[in-house]
Curated annotation (Swiss-Prot):
Phosphoserine: residues carrying this PTM: 393, 397, 687, 1575, 1617
Location of the region described as Phenylalkylamine binding in the Swiss-Prot/TrEMBL record: 1349-1391
Chain positions of I repeats: 38-337
Gene name as annotated: Cacna1s
Extracellular side: 71-85, 137-160, 219-279, 302-309, 452-462, 515-523, 582-601, 624-633, 819-830, 886-892, 951-1000, 1022-1038, 1141-1148, 1201-1231, 1290-1311, 1331-1356
Motif Selectivity filter of repeat II positions after renumbering to this chain: 612-615
UniProt note on tissues of expression: Skeletal muscle specific.
Glycosylation sites: 1141
Cellular component annotations (GO), alphabetically ordered: cytoplasm; dendritic spine head; I band; L-type voltage-gated calcium channel complex; plasma membrane; sarcolemma; sarcoplasmic reticulum; T-tubule
Transmembrane segments: 52-70, 86-106, 116-136, 161-179, 197-218, 310-330, 433-451, 463-483, 495-514, 524-542, 562-581, 634-653, 800-818, 831-850, 867-885, 893-911, 931-950, 1039-1060, 1119-1140, 1149-1170, 1181-1200, 1232-1250, 1269-1289, 1357-1381
Catalytic activity line of the entry: Ca(2+)(in) = Ca(2+)(out)
Protein's UniProt name: Voltage-dependent L-type calcium channel subunit alpha-1S
């Protein structure tokens, strides 16, 4: 084989990878010596590409994994025979892998060829693993030899080998390279790495900031605890971990007798959790962010320093860290996932078709699964076409041949009879009745299974047994009937039927086995539960549900590969864990650590536990302790756990969610598409039914139909993104498809969107319209015109009244929160009771007024017809009743008192924004219904299986040696802490676990807690130890039970719960979109347009005072920025270096450094104040932030100085002398530590520097703005639950060692809220639930009845906590996620699509051209401005000049009369062209449509602004587009003429052919398509430019550099010596700009030019008088004309004939002699001006009227000098005789045609414009109009026979 040609290689690269490799073109040589003909290499190639070889290798890898898993790690490096055997086997694997690697290297070459071995990432991984294996083996041998030679050598020599051995665990990764679907999931995860990296930075940043704050605030506070006096024994209560204490202040005092608080304790968690130095501080903070064990840390800090303010630190940490930043991960992953899928989708129509078929197949498969193979057509049956089996037709043909025969006739009769019977049977099976019968049987089956429970009576067991057999028989009959009716082949086509058959057969098998006594009845009874899956049959008649299930099954596919990846990941970490921790989890204390790594199954369970994040921190603490505690080697262990937790919990588990959200959106669109089809059908029927009605009537009917779903409030119809629509609507491949919703044109949009989404709520005005008085009379007395009623109406609808009531609602809520739950008769409660009377009175009056106004409930629009009003009425009624029932039964009053909590809900009716969020939540709950159903079904199924497996098995005795209840009596001894001297006698108790599986309900409860990931390991180990019914546990009795829990967790917790979350997110997103349903702009377009309309230019302050300017120059330079950046980093490092117990010297150094940094930052502030002046300085929020920090730091320095001065008397706080023995460590007063925070805050300044992080922050703040109403709703939820909690659970006594304790209780309102916040983060909420249930001890101060000391708490706790947890976990947190995913979609969006985050750059760069923020710049600055902005918004600096001009033609922004463009108009035009908003079709019409859309969405947009960005029709605006279009046409014509001149060496006068060719060039080249690069050959143009330079030099004339395309720097020259280029730019950029900005390929940048640049500067004046002299009165005052007048005077002075040229006057110059002085002046000027390298003067026939700066007052340093004659350069004109009157028709036609070709129809239609262009054309090329006309006529004549197709230039 010869080496492949480069073409082949190119092709090969393009082709997608196929799983089966085609024969790759192999490198001719491998390893420099082996050619393709070499027999060894041939053999290797054939082996490596032999399919079984791959399989063998995969199997070997698998075997190796098994071997690694079987290995038993032991403490102290002990070994057993199995392990030694495995060590030997290891060599075998090593040899196999080495051979494989060697063969592949020989076959493919090692490194240097394109397809060499090491060029594939997976091969690199393989190679490293094999290499390390071989290396380890060699080292081991060396070690053995060493030990033999030197027997005394230490054991340490083997250590390095052990470390290397750990690399073996990577071998399972090689499976990935064998399984393609895994690579897809991995790829999308890798793709997300970049945005994830930004988030990781943000998280790291947060962790660092919080760690340093923690270090400053809590350093050394955690080292005191209660010791018994005189001993080192820590004093604790039973069940309580030791915790810090405080001698004084509000920390925890030592209450146990004989104990004292003193230091010397290592700290909580054996000294791992503390803030004593930066490292541990970071670990602690990270643990808090993961929301595991954060409350423990908070409680320890509270115990140490009091609970007044530490909660602020922790709650903000959780809110920012966990809820916000970590949810970003989800946003990014789901974005990436969707993007990957979109990519896959857009890979072509074929793919699309395939996918469509796939979806249909899935659905069909699923439907048939449910409908038992509904494939046969009933008509076919009736005609008797059904063949019994394949052979049917053959028999018939046989019968025809052989003639009639008795047997055959019998067979025929029998078959006919059979056919009829089967047909009847088939009909029966398919009938609704049969279906419902089966459903009924399934329901009975479900009942019989669900009724099983522990200790059930015998008769029930007997009944269940009988029922089981009867039902089994019924199911068997059903199965046989189906088989008969449908035929076997048809029956087994449906998956559901196969499944059914399997269940029935297993049931029969079970009965046979049990009857014959071959097995115990339990084992297989799990199969009975699988029957419950039949419940899914219900979905057949429930489309949305069936779609949901179809989408679930669909996503199971994508999830299968993810599960495989997850499993691989777990295996690797489990094996690594065994290598690291195997056999090491044996500690001094007697407690057994269940989550360990001592064998493979256990290691897998531990890894899985860390993945779910439940209690992962305790597993980590054990790991650290196993390696000697919180000292050097031990701490490194946390790296393993953190990597495992991050990769597993954040990345892999979020991919689950991403897949779920993605598939759900699909399911939604399926459902809505079906709905749409149904609508369509209805519509068709209606239009069929109305043949005689007029069109209008019909359309109104359909309109009504369309509005109908709206009334029902179905939220799902918002997304109709189904393939059919895509194919119809977006035929043109539009890269930005607009969110078009076909068929919905209702105009009755609600004023306010029904969504929690922000934008609208922020913008729309929440005006409440007064409801008119209803027609009917109220209370049968007051007629609508009654004076009293009218007065009531006026009062009720007054804003002051609403606000007054709102105020009272707030006050009454506050009163509820202030009540004392324990002492009912306290003074406070009595006062509050009087207030209560007042509130009730006010609310009653309000309701009476409203009822008087609107009537009670008998007619439409009356008071009680509104749900919110009924709520009001209920609340008031409850208050009134409870006042009346003071004396009677306490329980009733108690319930009524609790109901008062609903008062805050009345605010919902008053605040509109809140009302919409609430409605949205309700909509979400309604749509979630289906998912809840599916989840509940699955949960129920698992609960039934759990009952079968574990009923009655969760009992135990506290004396572990006793196994049954009978034995568990009397007393037993216990040794405290394993110390034989401390003996205690305890009574034995037979304990039932709190969560158990004794009946279906408690099983569902237990499983629910498992699905929230709380406390599931405890339950799991209980299940693993479970033994027989009613006996105690046996350690690790049934490890296989873990499978049940793991499957449940994966299916329910990972999958269903995520789908749940996904559903909420999708619903919210849709709700947000509904209100924009008909506005044709998608979300991104809306945001960008909104930005463009609302943005205002920034002021860019440049001082005039030279000294101040120097300071400003320094402060704004990038070097200064970098210096400050470095200083902040240094400051951070210094802060991080502090630690507990540091030396005096260290203290001294850190104080000095602090002072130094404070001084430096103060200096920075002073310099900036000087540079920007206070007004400019405080205009920037970052500066304000800096200012506050500096002030705080100064206070901090002063305080610490005073403190050191007063150190002798005990520091600052002992000035009063009352200090005595205060320990400064314990003071929780906001001491100097508070001011120390300012040191840390400097860090935050770093955020303003990093680009990616800054964008993140920007979006962050945007999503905060989006949350106000959501936040309000959350506050309300917490408030209501907290008050209920205080009423219901406030009396429970606080007992240390239980969950209701000093830190966690319902006794005050703040405590209750904190407890609820803890539940919302899921911290052991199920423990709190149990601690609040009935039978708890009451608080001694509460008023319980005698004998009811243990009657506190209530079983209402179950409903309370579960409802709260569900609301929080599923709705509230998801609101966060939804808002975040909404705002952060830009992170993963294609960056080439313009988004709102790109638009800030425009503001910043505009400010440099418009430092005064006037909002206008010269239109010639626009090109340079846009070339400085990077795409997608600008053109970027590499955009060739002509392309930039062509783009400007397309943008078409309005040009003001003074030649400037406005800020908003420019930005709007940019956004509009970049996002293709209404750019197609008729331009004026598009403009009108866009105006209408803007008016509709942003109702408050001022008309002035709107006219500025989109000029109204009929406003004959000059636009930048027209301007540049003229330019391009002239430019090309000139170019062509120049080429002609070069060619002939002189100027051809009347050669029409040539001129026609020239015009043709114009047509071709003036087209403004953006995507076309510079037309024509670049090299030709360069030559042309060179020729032009030479020509110019010969003539000895230097023309004005620039014109349109050069550097118009002469107008920028200022009196100072700065290079002219930079009139308005930051001096710092000079150096860079000279080269970079001036190097576009052909032309150079144009810099700001003067307003009168172009003949079109005022095209909206009447062009009919274009031939009138410039002196015409209508023009006299325009700046352009003043400039021309000025020029004329100058010319006259110079003694030169006046050229009559002005914007619209014809340039018929009178010939004259050029004065010598002028040439001198030009030459002088030329020598003065440095010409940048490569700059060329423009072409000789440049259109060049002299343009002059107009002096604008107030421009400050920017106004240009009009006095200096230096800044003029003149152009000589070739004499010309006649002034032409107007453009001739042929030229007009030609120009129009050229414009149309270029896509500028709107300009072609503009007669004035065409005329001006014609004039400019003749003018520019110094030709007679007649010459142009002749050429044009000739050209058009030639064109016409060809049908107008203009020939291209040859």
């Amino acid at each position: 084989m010869e080496p492949s040609s480069p073409q082949d290689e190119g092709l090969r690269k393009k082709q997608p990878k196929k799983p089966v490799p085609e024969i790759l073109p192999r490198p001719p040589r491998a390893l420099f010596c082996l050619t393709l003909q070499n027999p060894l290499r041939k053999a290797c190639i054939s082996v490596v590409e032999w399919k079984p070889f791959e399989t063998i290798i995969l199997l070997t890898i698998f075997a190796n994994c098994v071997a690694l898993a079987v290995y038993l790690p032991m403490p102290e490096d002990d070994n057993n025979t199995l392990n030694l055997g495995l060590e030997k086997l290891e060599y075998f694997f090593l040899i196999v892998f080495s051979i494989e690697a060697a063969m592949k290297i020989i076959a493919y070459g090692f490194l240097f060829h394109q397809d060499a071995y090491l060029r594939s990432g997976w091969n690199v991984l393989d190679f490293i693993i094999v290499f390390l294996g071989v290396f380890t083996a060699i080292l081991e041998q060396v070690n053995i030899i060493q030990t033999n030679t030197a027997p005394m050598s230490s054991k340490g020599a083997g250590l390095d080998v052990k470390a290397l051995r750990a690399f073996r665990v990577l071998r399972p990764l090689r499976l990935v390279s064998g399984v393609p679907s895994l690579q897809v999931v991995l790829n999308s995860i890798f793709k997300a790495m970049l945005p994830l990296f930004h988030i990781a930075l943000l998280v790291l940043f947060m962790v660092i900031i919080y760690a340093i704050i923690g270090l400053e605030l809590f350093k050394g506070k955690m080292h005191k605890t209660c010791y018994f006096i005189g001993t080192d024994i820590v004093a604790t209560v039973e069940n309580e971990k030791p915790s810090p204490c405080a001698r004084t202040g509000s920390g925890r005092p030592c209450t146990i007798n004989g104990s004292e608080c003193r230091g010397g304790w290592p700290g909580p968690n054996h000294g791992i959790t503390h803030f004593d130095n930066f490292g541990f501080s970071m670990l602690t903070v990270y643990q808090c962010i993961s929301m595991e064990g954060w409350t423990d840390v908070l409680y320890w800090v509270n115990d140490a320093i009091g609970n007044e303010w530490p909660w602020i630190y922790f709650v903000t940490l959780i809110l920012l860290g966990s809820f916000f930043i970590l949810n970003l991960v989800l946003g990014v992953l789901s974005g990436e996932f969707t993007k990957e899928r979109e990519k896959a989708k857009s890979r072509g129509t074929f793919q699309k078709l395939r996918e469509k078929q796939q979806l249909e197949e899935d659905l069909r498969g699923y439907m048939s699964w449910i409908t038992q193979g509904e494939v046969m057509d009933v008509d076919d049956l009736r005609e008797g076409k059904l063949s019994l089996d394949e052979g049917g037709s053959d028999t018939e043909s046989l019968y025809e041949i052989e003639g009639l025969n008795k047997i055959i006739q019998f067979i025929r009769h029998w078959r006919q009879w059979n056919r009829v019977f089967r047909w009847k049977c088939h009909d029966l099976v398919k009938s609704k009745v049969f279906y419902w019968l089966v459903i009924l049987i399934v329901a009975l089956n479900t009942l019989s299974i669900a009724s099983e429970h522990h200790n059930q009576p015998l008769w029930l067991t007997h009944l269940q047994d009988v029922a089981n057999r009867v039902l089994l028989a019924l199911f068997t009959i059903e199965m046989l009937m189906k088989m008969y009716g449908l035929g076997l082949r048809q029956y087994f086509m449906s998956i559901f039927n196969r499944f059914d058959c399997f269940v029935v057969c297993s049931g029969i098998l079970e009965i046979l086995l049990v009857e014959s006594g071959a097995m115990t009845p339990l084992g297989i009874s799990v199969l009975r539960c699988i029957r419950l899956l039949r419940l899914f049959k219900i979905t057949k008649y429930w489309t949305s549900l069936s779609n949901l299930v179809a989408s679930l099954l669909n996503s199971i596919r994508s999830i299968a590969s993810l599960l495989l990846l997850l499993f691989l990941f777990m295996i690797i970490f489990a094996l690594l864990g065994m290598q690291l921790f195997g056999g090491r989890y044996d500690f001094e204390d007697t407690e057994v650590r269940r989550s360990n790594f001592d064998n493979f199954p256990q290691a897998l369970i531990s890894v899985f536990q860390v993945l779910t994040g439940e209690d992962w921190n305790s597993v980590m603490y054990n790991g650290i302790m196993a390696y000697g505690g919180p000292s050097y080697p031990g701490v490194l262990v946390c790296i393993y756990f953190i990597i495992l937790f991050v990769c597993g919990n954040y990345i892999l588990l979020n991919v689950f969610l991403a897949i779920a959200v993605d598939n759900l959106a699909e399911a939604e669109s399926l459902t809505s598409a079906q709905k749409a089809k149904a609508e369509e059908r209805k519509r068709r029927k209606m239009s069929r039914g109305l043949p005689d009605k007029s069109e209008e009537e019909r359309s109104t009917m359909t309109k009504k139909l369309e509005q109908k779903p709206k009334g029902e409030g179905i939220p799902t119809t918002a997304k109709l993104k189904i393939d059919e629509f895509e194919s119809n609507v977006n035929e043109v491949k539009d890269p930005y498809p607009s969110a078009d919703f076909p068929g919905d044109d209702e105009e009755d949009e609600p004023e306010i969107p029904a969504s929690p989404r922000p934008r609208p709520l922020a913008e729309l005005q929440l005006k409440e319209k007064a409801v008119p008085i209803p027609e009917a009379s109220s209370f049968f007395i007051f007629s609508p015109t009654n004076k009293i009623r009218v007065l009531c109406h006026r009062i009720v609808n007054a804003t002051w009244f609403t606000n007054f009531i709102l105020l009272f609602i707030l006050l009454s809520s506050a009163a509820l929160a202030a009540e004392d739950p324990i002492r009912a008769d306290s003074m406070r409660n009595q006062i509050l009771e009087y207030f209560d009377y007042v509130f009730t009175a006010v609310f009653t009056v309000e309701i009476v007024l409203k009822m008087t106004t609107y009537g009670a409930f008998l007619h439409k629009g009356s008071f009680c017809r509104n749900y919110f009003n009924i709520l009001d009425l209920l609340v008031v009624a409850v208050s009134l009743i409870s006042m009346g029932l003071e004396s009677s039964a306490i329980s009733v009053v108690k319930i009524l008192r609790v109901l008062r909590v609903l008062r805050p809900l009345r605010a919902i009716n008053r605040a509109k924004g809140l009302k919409h969020v609430v409605q949205c939540v309700f909509v979400a709950i309604r749509t979630i219904g289906n998912i809840v159903l599916v989840t509940t079904l699955l949960q129920f199924m698992f609960a039934c299986i759990g009952v079968q497996l574990f009923k009655g098995k969760f009992y135990s005795c506290n004396d572990l040696s006793k196994m049954t209840e009978e034995e568990c009596r009397g007393y037993y001894y216990i040794y405290k802490d394993g110390d034989p001297t401390q003996i205690e006698l305890r009574p034995r108790q037979w304990i039932h676990n709190d969560f158990h599986f004794d009946n279906v309900l408690s099983a569902m409860m237990s499983l629910f807690t498992v699905s929230t990931f709380e406390g599931w390991p405890q339950l799991l180990y209980k299940a693993i130890d479970s033994n027989e019914e009613d006996t105690g546990p046996v350690y690790n009795n049934r490890v296989e039970m873990a499978i049940f829990f793991i499957i449940y967790i994966i299916l329910i917790a990972f999958f269903m719960m995520n789908i749940f979350v996904g559903f909420v997110i999708v619903t919210f997103q849709e709700q947000g979109e509904t209100e924009y349903k008909n506005c044709e702009l998608d979300k991104n377009q809306r945001q960008c347009v909104q930005y463009a309309l609302k943005a205002r230019p920034l002021r860019c302050y440049i001082p005039k005072n030279p000294y101040q300017y120097q300071v400003w120059y320094v402060v704004t330079s990038s070097y200064f920025e970098y210096l400050m950046f470095a200083l902040i980093m240094l400051n951070t490092i210094c802060l991080g270096m502090q630690h507990y117990n540091q030396s005096e010297q260290m203290n001294h150094i850190s104080d000095i450094l602090n002072v130094a940094f404070t001084i430096i930052f103060t200096l920075e502030m002073i310099l900036k104040l000087i540079a920007f002046k206070p007004r400019g300085y405080f205009g920037d929020p970052w500066n304000v932030f800096d200012f506050l920090i500096v002030i705080g730091s100064i206070i901090d320095v002063i305080l610490s100085e005073i403190d050191t001065l007063l150190a002798s008397s005990g520091g600052l706080y002992c000035l009063g002398g009352g200090c005595g023995n205060v320990d400064p460590d314990e003071s929780a007063r906001i001491s100097s530590a508070f001011f120390r925070l300012f040191r840390v805050m400097r860090l935050i300044k770093l955020l303003s520097r990093a680009e990616g992080v800054r964008t993140l922050l920007w979006t962050f703040i945007k999503s905060f703005q989006a949350l106000p109403y959501v936040a309000l709703l959350i506050v309300m939820l917490f408030f209501i639950y907290a008050v209920i909690g205080m009423q219901m659970f406030g009396k429970i006594a606080m007992v240390d060692g239980t969950q209701i304790n000093r830190n966690n209780n319902f006794q005050t309102f703040p405590q209750a809220v904190l407890l609820l916040f803890r539940c919302a983060t899921g911290e052991a909420w199920q423990e709190i639930l149990l601690a609040c249930s009935y039978g708890k001890r009451c608080d001694p101060e509460s008023d319980y009845a005698p004998g009811e000391e243990y009657a506190c708490g209530t079983n209402f706790a179950y409903y309370y906590f579960i409802s709260f947890y569900m609301l929080c976990a599923f709705l509230i947190i998801n609101l966060f996620v939804a808002v975040i995913m909404d705002n952060f979609d830009y992170l993963t969006r294609d960056w080439s699509i313009l988004g709102p985050h790109h638009l800030d750059e425009f503001k910043a760069i505009w400010a440099e051209y418009d430092p005064e923020a006037k909002g206008r710049i010269k239109h010639l600055d626009v090109v340079t401005l846009l070339r400085r902005i990077q795409p997608p918004l600008g053109f970027g600096k590499f955009c060739p000049h002509r392309v930039a001009c062509k783009r400007l033609v397309g943008m078409n922004m309005p040009l003001n009369s003074d030649g400037t463009v406005t800020f908003n108009a420019t930005l709007f035009a940019l956004v509009r062209t970049a996002l293709k908003i209404k750019t197609e079709g008729n331009f004026e019409q598009a403009n009108e449509e866009l105006r209408a859309i803007i008016k509709k969405i942003w109702k408050r947009t001022s008309m002035k602004l709107l006219d500025q960005v989109i000029p109204p029709i009929g406003d004959d605006e000059v636009t930048v587009g027209k301007f540049y279009a003229t330019f391009l046409i002239q430019e090309h014509f000139r170019k062509f003429m120049k080429r002609q001149e070069e060619y002939y060496g002189y100027r051809p006068k009347k050669d029409t052919v040539q001129i026609q060719a020239g015009l043709r060039t114009i047509e071709e080249e003036a087209a403004p398509e953006i995507h076309r690069a510079i037309s024509g050959d670049l090299t030709a143009e360069e030559e042309l430019e060179r020729a032009m330079v030479e020509a110019a030099m010969e003539e000895g004339i230097f023309r004005r550099t620039g014109g349109l395309f050069g550097q118009v720097d002469n107008f920028l020259e200022r009196t100072n010596s700065l290079p002219p280029v930079m009139a308005n730019q930051r001096p710092l950029q000079f150096a860079e700009m000279e080269m970079e900005e001036l190097e576009s390929p052909v032309f150079l940048e144009d810099f700001p030019q003067n307003p009168g640049t172009h003949p079109l500067a005022r095209a909206n004046t009447n062009n009919a008088n274009a031939n009138v002299a410039y002196g015409n009165s209508s023009h006299r005052n325009s700046p352009v004309f003043s400039s021309i007048r000025y020029e004329r005077e100058l010319l006259e002075e110079a003694g030169r004939p006046v050229t009559r040229e002005g914007p619209f006057s014809q340039p018929c110059s009178v010939s004259g002699v050029n004065s010598r002085s002028h040439v001198d002046k030009l030459e002088r000027q030329m020598s003065q001006r440095r010409m940048p390298k490569g700059q060329v003067p423009p072409s000789p026939c440049q259109l060049s009227q002299e343009k002059h700066p107009v002096h604008e007052e107030g421009k400050g340093p920017r106004s240009w000098s009009t006095e200096t004659s230096d800044s003029e350069s003149f152009e000589e004109r070739v004499p010309r005789n006649s002034a032409h009157k107007c453009t001739a028709p042929a030229t007009t036609m030609l120009i129009q045609e050229a414009l149309v070709r270029g896509g500028l129809d709107s300009l072609a239609a503009d007669a004035n414009f065409v005329m001006a262009t014609g004039q400019a054309l003749a003018d520019a090329c110094q030709m007679e109009p007649e010459e142009v006309e002749v050429a044009a006529t000739e050209l058009l004549k030639r064109e016409s026979p060809k049908g107008g197709a203009m020939p291209r230039e040859p």
